[in-house]
Amino acid sequence: MEEEDESRGKTEESGEDRGDGPPDRDPALSPSAFILRAIQQAVGSSLQGDLPNDKDGSRCCGLQWRRCCRSPRSEPRSQESGGADMATVLDTAADSFLVELVSILDPPDTWVPSHLDLQPGESEDVLELVAEVRIGDRDPMPLPVPSLLPRLRAWRTGKTVSPQSHASRPACSRHLLTLGTGDGGPAPPPAPSSASSSPSPSPSSSSPSPPPPPPPPPPPALPAPRFDIYDPFHPTDEAYSPPPAPEQKYDPFEPTGSNPSSSAGTPSPEEEEEEEEEEEEEGLSQSISRISETLAGIYDDNSLSQDFPGDDSPHREPPPPQTLGAPGTPPQADSTRAEGAPRRRVFVVGPEAEACLEGKVSVEVVTTAGGPALPLPPLPPTDPEIEEGEIVQPEEEPRVAVSLFRAARPRQPPASVATLASVAAPAAPPASAPRAPEGDDFLSLHADSDGEGALQVDLGEPPAPPAADARWGGLDLRRKILTQRRERYRQRSASPGPPPARKKARRERQRSGDPAPPDSPTWEAKKHRSRERKLGSHSTARRRSRSRSRRRSRSRSADRRRGSHRSRSREKRRRRRRSASPPPAASSSSSSRRERHRGKRREGGKKKKKRSRSRAEKRSGDLEKLPAPVPPSGSDRDSRRRGAVPPSIQDLTDHDLFAIKRTITVGRPDKTEPRAPSPAPAVSPKREVLYDSEGLSADERGAKGDKDRRRSGAASSSSSSREKASRRKALDGDRGRDRDRSSKKTRPPKDSAPGSGALPKAPPSSGSSSSSSSCSSRKVKLQSKVAVLIREGVSSTTPAKDSSSSGLGSIGVKFSRDRESRSPFLKPDERAPAEGVKVAPGSTKPKKTKAKAKAGAKKAKGTKGKTKPSKTRKKVRSGGSSTASGGPGSLKKSKADSCSQAASAKGTEETSWSGEERTTKAPSTPPPKVAPPPPALTPDSQTVDSSCKTPEVSFLPEEASEDTGVRVGAEEEEEEEEEEEEEEEQQPATTTATSTAAAAPSTAPSAGSTAGDSGAEDGPAARASQLPTLPPPMPWNLPAGVDCTTSGVLALTALLFKMEEANLASRAKAQELIQATNQILSHRKPPSTLGVTPAPVPTSLGLPPGPSSYLLPGSLPIGGCGSTPPTPTGLVPASDKREGSSSSEGRGDTDKYLKKLHTQERAVEEVKLAIKPYYQKKDITKEEYKDILRKAVHKICHSKSGEINPVKVSNLVRAYVQRYRYFRKHGRKPGDPPGPPRPPKEPGPPDKGGPGLPLPPL
């Protein structure tokens, strides 16, 4: 049934020959139409998908045909057009359809021309179709390859030709896929899209394919845009992918089945087709879910005839599902990666799979040119999603697969391929068998999934099971594949260098933006490998390519920002993580990964694998972190519910996972990039776990994850891109923050994973864990963005109060904007890694840079914790490792991250023991900030640290070593307070900060002790030093105050507005948090009364920090806490803090200090509430709003009565507003005129009573 196995040739052939080819089909009808009709008959629900396949198959650039036709679809040549490929037809119509197909297939002699007309550059590597159609038990009918090949030529030549792509939208999709995948390069390796073999999958494949830079705009406009946007900003894929995300209706069991198509469905016509198919596939999804259930282990079968099971039982009607587009996928993969597409794809759809599938369609596509004849895995035409997302990560797979697959390429003998194809045909678990025979191809599905090349590994091993593949039960196959994958991953792990390097290079290239062209060529090579891999895992490959494309887009944008440093660090992290926790490492999404990881290490593992692959390219670093850890389930689910934050793996159901994947698609590219080298090993286990736990082949899950990612690609992709951008550059402050938010949402699971995984991983490699955690934390931090922060903060504020750990995890409301706003003020070092930026947000208060760094660490922790309270707690409680995890969460806050890791892990540790010393060190904290050496930091962390390193290292050695630790504790507390104040000002942020701070300090002791105080001292000192380096010039108070004022104020103000809504809830939580903080600080600070108290007192300054940030402009750190002058003085902070302590009356007077802090926080909230109406009415400008807030808070805090009377506050604010309005009218600056008015207002200070009297001390 060479059916379209030359799917490329088929494209045209499909469309044109179909006219001829489908004599049975009623040539009168356009091949697509006829096939559609036939498919409708055969597969009611699959029909739509089939139709797209039809269109794709016949016109669809060889893409779909590659996917569909190559696979059993090609058998239904006539149907192929219809998209109800032979496989599907065989499945559904079995004999009758088979006969029809055979008759049609026979005519298709023209369909598969012996030689393809390939566009220059499209080596014949497309496919040499050796197809054999076996209907039922009948003898295989060799289809004339020539007929298919001509079509391929047409497709190839007209690859961009709309005729086929226009012939039918699916055709376009396929074309797109082909173009996108093949040319688009790695991303489209929608070979996984092959999964798209079913129409829906095809689109999915198509979706991923567009991401590749295949320029062939001709196919559809969609592809072109994808190429254009995708190429430049692989986010396009995401953009496309997100629409499909909603389509993630694929069953939980079939993560890849529906999602791939849905995620990829939207991206391009193919994606649209996928969507159509998805509609069909809804039935298919159900059937697929049954299939996945039935063929849980027969992922390969699912891939080949994912729908097949559905077809047989649920989808018998939809032959396309059975077709699974394995052939179609190959075409897509091939056409997509025509240059480097797998040359050989043998898809056998036959009774083996199911009795119902009497027809056995064996299509072997042997590509002549392009070196690697990557056998595209037979992808389920209808249920390509399972196959697609299965394990193949479109982006990763192509890259990782390249090297492996090149070697594997040769492996695809027509016979074996055919066997595999035949295995695929059976809807039953046996269907998967063909993949093993396909060996690399089919395993490639699994290997493809390897974000880091893990999938590649799968390629090699699966060949062993080929014979049994079809017979493997869903579970057996899964296990077998998993085992093989593990071995492969291990092998890869042992020698991940070449593929990962290549992948990395490609990813980096892509990230660099140079990717599109280089990626195309590289991808071609890789595509070949990928395709070989994808032969077995075409839909996975397609998905991966999609994910990869997205990742590339994200990676490219992010990587461009981050540069190779980030990629490398990520890769390292990934490698570490994969090495440390290979199973989780492959987690589809970092967020999903993390969260899922916890709950479903297996399930999560697979998904995480996918995610991590998807993200690996996107955020390999983050993903790296996420994969190893097993995220707690509670957090995951909450995250998922939130939507912003992906749920924990353990809590996630397949649907949840799908949703998460959609959301998490963002992070996936990251993982792929750095993880490429070591991910393979890690992925294998993860995949394995997913495979086993979910009963879906790991590939399926991966595909699903990919698809989810793709679906959430648009949103996630942008998020991912943003995340990457953030990670990469502080420059992309907003973007980074958005990304961070997105990432955080995506990453929280990762963070969780690092929390769980980091701890486990910490033992293996504390640094690695830190690094991973750092990434996770950073993600969490991202997640802790204002939106997420408020959400998380409000809900988790209470938990934070409940326990320091809770506190840590309770409020993740640290506004990412802090970093953004502060980024200008942050030292280049801090910002340099773009993680530094995160540091700033982490330690929103520049007031105490060190505190900030610590705060960053803490907040990273806290944020992380807040984002996933339980996870953070677990992490923190876990000890230094968890702290490190928290720290890593702040990876983006390079410094904060360092501090988070060293200071958070160690700083936290130090907090308990060195809190006392901290006070002493407080004055020199800013200098210690330099301490860039994070002893325990992993290369990533160190990289971040190095970026954060400042010349103040000298301070770090002296005080940083000894005092930094103390400071970390004291500073943390101070920061807690400061952050509380500031965040209180920011409302939810304040609560979060306080919660985080409180939890961090409290956790610090436990985590700190766990991690080891001595180590903590060193690391924290260094990190603390580093952190202070940010605002080294400013003393703690000043840095916090000044930074807050300069960069923090803006961020705070902006956040204040954003968080104002969360103000009330925040307030309640803040109060609780304050109480908790008081308790924590009382407990903690009493032990280090003198040492810590000064820090708290400075925190007093910290108190002012919130206001101070606003007052800072007035250069009066609202040191209303006892040090007004210090704000300007950079060194005053020590004395300032001391003063603050004094004013707080007692370094041991933590309660008083806390009281002041809380008062300030409450004042901030009250003032905000009072100002809000004016601001909303635009009676005052933002600047005025900030000034009034600062002044009013200062006044209120310094009022004699010290009480916060809402009425008085309102009056004070009104007076300020009036004054400012008056001055504005008269062209005077409130600063000048307020001078006189201020005195009047000063009386107000006693009780902030009087109409707002702006205190002169601003």
UniProtKB/Swiss-Prot annotation:
Positions carrying Phosphothreonine: 329, 665, 925, 938, 950
Region (Disordered): 1-32, 159-345, 370-398, 410-1034, 1114-1154, 1223-1258
Family, per entry: Belongs to the splicing factor SR family.
Signal sequence extent: none
PANTHER family: SPLICING FACTOR, ARGININE/SERINE-RICH 19, SPLICING FACTOR, ARGININE_SERINE-RICH 19
GO molecular function terms attached to this record: protein domain specific binding; RNA binding; RNA polymerase II C-terminal domain binding
Naturally occurring in which organism (per UniProt): Rattus norvegicus (Rat)
Protein name per its UniProtKB record: Splicing factor, arginine/serine-rich 19
Entries under Pfam families matching the protein: SCAF11-like_C
PTM sites of type Phosphotyrosine: 691
Biased composition (Basic residues): 480-491, 540-555, 562-579, 594-613, 845-877
GO cellular component, one term: nucleus
Main location: nucleus
Keyword list, A-Z: Isopeptide bond, mRNA processing, mRNA splicing, Nucleus, Phosphoprotein, Repeat, RNA-binding, Ubl conjugation
GO biological process: mRNA processing; RNA splicing; transcription by RNA polymerase II
Subunit structure: Interacts with POLR2A.
